[in-house]
């Protein structure tokens, strides 16, 4: 039996008193029954507000035989309301509310339908939360990402059409450099559009090892470089991506090899002279 449980089944043989509602209980149902051997007993199902230990439950239900609920909520409730063995009852306390089954698939489906946070399953689905909370938080992050991306709006201009036309003709050497010196030309907005509609990786720059680690074989790599990072842009990393061989030595050595990557730089500045050969950069002015 799990050490701490929310949902319990209980049986009290030859009861002298009947269970009463407590502040710790969210929902309870029971009835007085007569078993096959004629023993008078209380058969009940209880959902606690918090996970409780067997010791705690014995304090709440003295003399009861207690077990963790094994079936569904509805099955447990119905079992305590069956007519063929009933003497008195059934008696219900609190509000019965169906929650999703305590397994990863159903919890993820419920998250998608209700938009609940993972923490909200701590008590209703404790086993899934304990075993798979990291997965639930990743699902939540992906849901939040999808929601944010669906809210993005795109406005196109002449230069975005030029970029699309360039990408329509793959070239293993070419790096597309989108130059807009004033800001507000829509470079980041277009980067968002590519992330939303294409298999695109986005980076505002940073340490090369971190960028290599985050890259997950996307078809398009976008470097949206803010003005303050002009002096820190790693031009060699751009060539690594364009060459299709990206290496990271962070945590453990990683070598990523891809057939073709479209590299796009969005910047308020031009590339430094002498860094690239003339055929390497395709300049697009905003």
UniProtKB/Swiss-Prot annotation:
A GO term for molecular function: DNA binding
Alphabetical GO biological process terms: DNA replication; rolling circle single-stranded viral DNA replication
Signal peptide: none
Enzyme Commission designation: 2.7.7.-, 3.1.21.-, 3.6.1.-
Residues binding ATP: 180-188
Record has Nucleotidyltransferase as a keyword: yes
Residues that coordinate or bind a divalent metal cation: 33, 41, 84
RCR-3, short sequence motif: residues: 79-82
Function: Essential for the replication of all genomic viral ssDNA (trans-replication). The closed circular ssDNA genome is first converted to a superhelical dsDNA. Rep binds a specific hairpin at the genome origin of replication. Introduces an endonucleolytic nick within the conserved sequence 5'-A[GT]TATTAC-3' in the intergenic region of the genome, thereby initiating the rolling circle replication (RCR). Following cleavage, binds covalently to the 5'-phosphate of DNA as a tyrosyl ester. The cleavage gives rise to a free 3'-OH that serves as a primer for the cellular DNA polymerase.
Protein name: Master replication protein
Species: Banana bunchy top virus (isolate Autralia)
